[in-house]
Amino acid sequence: MTKSELVEKLAARFPQLLLRDADISVKTILDAMSEALADGHRIEIRGFGSFGLNKRPPRVGRNPKSGERVLVPEKRVPHFKAGKELRERVDRTVTQGGGMNGNGHAPHGKTGQSQLGSQSPASLHDDGQLNLVRS
């Protein structure tokens, strides 16, 4: 789901909201979340999950062009941990045979193929058996 799809869903769910107002609402929420993470805070949305930061320690890397050793500084990266309710809902959807294709992604169209037309590398049968497709 893209941000614009989320805006459209919000506007459809609340008809009193203009599309412009739904867009402003979504942007405001995302900006607040981004700012909180940038300030080093943790975000918890009960039933959905939490956003936090993981620290990556400094390390020595290599410049791929020259092969020269380069010091890569410490950095913080955003991390999402799904909450129990979200994990259970996703698992229930997968085990009931709907909503996901075999590679762990939601299908893009009615055929279950991605927008590029590639076929899923695996499929899950109703009996729980996994079928891997080799190319």
From Swiss-Prot:
Region (Disordered), start-end ranges: 83-135
UniProt feature, compositional bias: Basic and acidic residues: 83-92
GO biological process: DNA recombination; regulation of DNA-templated transcription; regulation of translation
Record's GO cellular component terms: chromosome; cytosol
SUPFAM superfamilies with a match to the protein in the record: IHF-like DNA-binding proteins
Swiss-Prot/TrEMBL keywords: DNA recombination, DNA-binding, Transcription, Transcription regulation, Translation regulation
InterPro entries in the record: Hist_DNA-bd, IHF-like_DNA-bd_dom_sf, IHF_beta
Feature: compositional bias, Polar residues: 111-122
Gene Ontology molecular function: DNA binding; structural constituent of chromatin
Name of a matching Pfam family: Bac_DNA_binding
Secreted keyword on record: no
CDD domains noted in UniProt: IHF_B
Highest taxon of source: Bacteria
The protein's role, per its UniProt record: This protein is one of the two subunits of integration host factor, a specific DNA-binding protein that functions in genetic recombination as well as in transcriptional and translational control.
Family: Belongs to the bacterial histone-like protein family.
Subunit (UniProt): Heterodimer of an alpha and a beta chain.
Record-linked HAMAP family: IHF_beta (MF_00381)
PANTHER family: DNA-BINDING PROTEIN HU, INTEGRATION HOST FACTOR SUBUNIT BETA
Protein name (record): Integration host factor subunit beta
Species per Swiss-Prot/TrEMBL record: Cupriavidus metallidurans (strain ATCC 43123 / DSM 2839 / NBRC 102507 / CH34) (Ralstonia metallidurans)
Species classification: Bacteria, Pseudomonadati, Pseudomonadota, Betaproteobacteria, Burkholderiales
